[in-house]
UniProtKB/Swiss-Prot annotation:
Induction: By nodal/nr-1 in the left lateral plate mesoderm. Involved in left-right asymmetry of the developing embryo. May play an important role in development and maintenance of anterior structures. Could play a role at the interface of lateral plate signaling and heart and gut morphogenesis. GO terms for molecular function: DNA-binding transcription factor activity, RNA polymerase II-specific; RNA polymerase II cis-regulatory region sequence-specific DNA binding. Belongs to the paired homeobox family. Bicoid subfamily. Residues 69-82 have a biased composition (Basic and acidic residues). Transmembrane segments: none annotated. GO terms for biological process: anatomical structure morphogenesis; embryonic organ morphogenesis; heart morphogenesis; regulation of transcription by RNA polymerase II. This is Pituitary homeobox 2. A motif (OAR) lies at residues 288-301. GO terms for cellular component: cytoplasm; nucleus. It comes from the Eukaryota.
Length: 326
């Protein structure tokens, strides 16, 4: 039985070895198949990547070789350069060159400007031909010259108004306080027409006229004083006849009617009315009553004394009214 078991055991071992070998061979064959598929896939991927690289290289070569792309690249580079540059460089590029004119060119341009300040296109072209300049330069020169001319005209007008017409207007447009310092307009009715306000200022019309005291008194007196004046003026011829060398035709003798020397020639009985009050004085009710009382007192007290020539006898009617007391 043991002998029978041993060969069976060997056969079994051989069979197991064959099966193992076959199984190992099968596994190895499968592994080889997997490696083949991987290698084939890698080779295919490598081919594809190579094709892509070749395609990219072809595209890049074709892009760089085209003129449009080259111009685009140049423009992009110039833009970057412009952006990198500073602002003063731009200003220097945009600034125009100043034109330096010769003396002959300036003489020709000035002579044309004196004749015509606004030349048209044809005239400017002719001037450009004469002066060897461009039409644009001639146009700019005329524009600047007109601006300078306008500025000079404005300055001259301002100087004329300041120097020529200034003193005249200042003399005519003085304030009222400087022109009439002796009285104010608010107290016009209270003060009246005093001769001080008239004598402080030069009025050639009134100073040249020899004003009649009777007419001036009739202008500025009340109705009561006018009636008394008419009666007293009626007595003037009889009073003047007693004075030797008196002339009624002259106005100076009429101015001397209010002097006390004429009143002494008239007797007391021949003058029943009060003598006229000083002329050219504005009278209200209070002033007229005070003046009449003072004159009555003088009439009774001063007739017996010798008369003294007053210094106000040679004055005019306006000044005489100020010197005599009221």
């Amino acid at each position: 039985m043991n002998s029978m078991k041993e060969p069976l055991h060997l056969d079994h071992l051989a069979g197991s070895r064959v099966a193992a070998a076959s199984s190992h061979h099968h596994h190895h064959h499968h592994h080889q198949h997997q490696t083949v598929t991987l290698v084939s896939m890698a080779s295919s991927l490598g081919q594809r990547s190579g094709e892509c690289k070749s395609r990219l290289e072809v595209h890049t070569i074709s892009d760089t070789s085209s003129p449009d792309t080259a111009d685009k690249d140049k423009s992009h580079q110039t833009k970057n350069e412009d952006s990198s540059t500073d602002d003063p460089s731009k200003k220097k590029r945009q600034r125009r060159q100043r034109t330096h004119f010769t003396s002959q060119q300036l003489q020709e341009l000035e002579a044309t400007f004196q004749r015509n300040r606004y030349p048209d296109m044809s005239t400017r072209e002719e001037i450009a031909v004469w002066t060897n300049l461009t039409e644009a330069r001639v146009r700019v020169w005329f524009k600047n010259r007109r601006a300078k001319w306008r500025k000079r005209e404005r300055n001259q007008q301002a100087e004329l108004c300041k120097n020529g017409f200034g003193p005249q207007f200042n003399g005519l447009m003085q304030p009222y306080d400087d022109m009439y310092p002796s009285y104010s307009y608010n107290n016009w009715a209270a003060k009246g027409l005093t001769s001080a306000s008239l004598s402080t200022k030069s009025f050639p019309f009134f100073n040249s006229m020899n004003v009649n005291p009777l007419s001036s008194q009739s202008m500025f007196s009340s109705p009561n004083s006018i009636s008394s004046m008419s009666m007293s003026s009626g007595m003037v011829p009889s009073a003047v006849t007693g004075v030797p060398g008196s002339g009624l035709n002259s106005l100076n003798n009429l101015n001397n009617l209010s002097n006390p020397s004429l009143n002494t020639a008239v007797p007391t009985s021949a003058c029943p009315y009060a003598p006229p009050t000083p002329p050219y004085v504005y009278r209200d009710t209070c002033n007229s009553s005070l003046a009449s009382l003072r004159l009555k007192a003088k009439q009774h007290s001063s007739f017996g004394y010798a008369t003294v020539q007053t210094p106000g006898s040679n004055l005019s009617a306006c000044q005489y009214a100020v010197d005599r007391p009221v």
